[in-house]
Amino acid sequence: MKYVILSDIHGNVDALLAVIKEIAEKENIIDNLLIAGDIVGYGASPNECCDIVRFLIYGRKKAGLESISKIIDQPYLDSKQKENILKAIISLEKKCIAIGGNHDMEASGEPSLTSEMNPIAKTAVDWTKGVLTKENLKFLRHLSLRMKFSKGGFEIVHSTPSYPRGYDYVKNAGALKYTTLWSKVTFGGHTHRPAAYIYTKETRTVNASVLIPADNYDMRLMLIEKESTNKVESFDIDFGKEWKYYINVGSVGQPRDGNPHACYVAFDSTSKHLDFRRVPYNTEAASKKIQEAALPNELAQRILKGA
């Protein structure tokens, strides 16, 4: 089966539309689109992103095509581009499965970790909470925090599988252990930085620092933890060995690895091949929406810089 896994859309409808179009054009037919949390937060289009995701999950009975067409009607898109994006969304109808992240939980009124959010994030999540429709509040509130796919040998979680509500940042291989990973492959997000780590029963090793280096090293692990000097964008997962993998799929709506392009992962559970993808989109439009919503300017600038 072929899966696309993405995370951290963060209310950025411009990035989401570009990624959906790319998936339809580049990945051919996929079996499932998986979203690893944080559909909202930071960006200025939380309802639009929720409406699209609800359509992808439940189909047109829960989110009509008319409302989707209105969302697609962006001034920088021509009629042909709009038509292609609508076709792409329809092609993924009822193929999506989504879990929640900390911003989703907080914005929907679920107890979370607002006190631990920085002031900019808290300002954005409070604004998001105030503009979300009742339907989207309910939708976010009922999202699971973890989802396992036994046939594929993997699971998705926003941060860590052992304590999904804790929203710990997996910034390097030392943040996890073999015993705290419950599946052969775990796909997560939260840091907004793509990465891939291999864990063995004896040691922790970094298989590949995908696209960017890990944030930092624990010097005590340096003898067993090595980082690839290559910017690997694809590799095969070895199901024959007793290894476990943690794959950070990066961010669609607010990358923080110095590359402003949206990021997602394509995974084929039959061939065991995994690809990281980057998708350019209209960052100026997304940044302008944030400014017009009077959200913190730092968020508008971060969209442009990817950092």
Residue ranges and their predicted role:
Residues 1-88:
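N-terminal active-site segment of His-dependent metallophosphoesterases
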Residues 55-150, 154-157, 163-182:
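Active-site neighborhood of divalent metal-dependent phosphoester bond hydrolases
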Residues 125-132, 137, 148, 159-173, ...:
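Active-site-proximal loop/helix segment associated with metal-binding centers of metalloenzymes
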Residues 23-29, 92, 150, 180-182, ...:
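Glycine-rich phosphate-binding loop signature in dinucleotide/nucleotide-binding domains
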Residues 10-17, 41-44, 103-108, 148, ...:
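Active-site environment of divalent metal-dependent phosphoester hydrolases
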Residues 6-7, 33-38, 42, 73, ...:
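Active-site neighborhood of phospho(di)ester-bond hydrolases with catalytic His/Asp-centered motifs
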Residues 1-4, 149-155, 239-245:
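Beta-strand-turn-beta hairpins that frame and shape the catalytic cleft
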Residues 202-307:
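Acidic, His/Gly-rich catalytic cores of divalent-metal-dependent hydrolytic chemistry
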